[in-house]
Amino acid sequence: MDQKIIDLFDRYTHGGMNRRDFLERLSLLAGSSAAALTLLPALENNYASAEIVPENDPAIKAEEPEIAPGIKGYLVRPSAEGTYPAVLVIHENRGLNPHIRDVTRRMAKEGFIAFGGDYLTAQGGTPADEEKAREMIGKLTPDEALAFSRSAIGALTKIQGSNGKAGAVGFCWGGGAVNALAVSGDPNFKAGVAYYGRQAPAAEVPKIAAPLLLHYASLDERINAGIAEFEAALKANGKAYELHMYEGANHAFNNDTNAARYSKEAADLAWSRTVEFLKKYLG
């Protein structure tokens, strides 16, 4: 697919462009309204097309609890008895959707207690309508999102079966939430993985106490604009971090329900690095 079309979709989903304007511009790029409509299925998430770990997988067990006051979500753990490190899975700007639920199950299959937090809990929970979810995410203040993250991390350190260590992995909006959690200096936060997430202000970097793994896509100009300043601050302050750039990949390359932007090669490599990193620091 033409990169200009992918970039337009990114601006639409992250920059406040309304759907009418998006469709008009898409029609211009595609050549006609009819052609534009044929492109939409590849641009928008199709949850029926990808599910790596089914809900009934016998290796895991899932529930939808409130792990702390106002902290609801999707909790998945290995079926086998034992103690495990815990990971907060932070969703994109469309809420706790089927894709993020699948990612949460994948994390549990790797040997973690995984909690896909629903950051829209206070607004009634993630709706089925993704456009509505995106609007609701836009109403969340940074302080509200951070408070949710910190409460979730604190609860996960004490949840039944936890080894007492908790980290976080986030995607897109959730990647930015991981970076925000890192600069909060929360003592319960032991490791973070941010997939193409907005960077924290350089002035806040000295507060970071946990190691970070940062995944970026080479075609993601919007997010990549902040890398240089953030990395310079990480280096200057002697922070433990790994940064990987995935050549030829787009923002959201991990999302296997999005045909236009998913990159299996980048996603598989980033996932293996993510699991190894979290086991190193939380295991």
Model-based region annotation:
Residues 16-24, 33-52:
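N-terminal twin-arginine translocation
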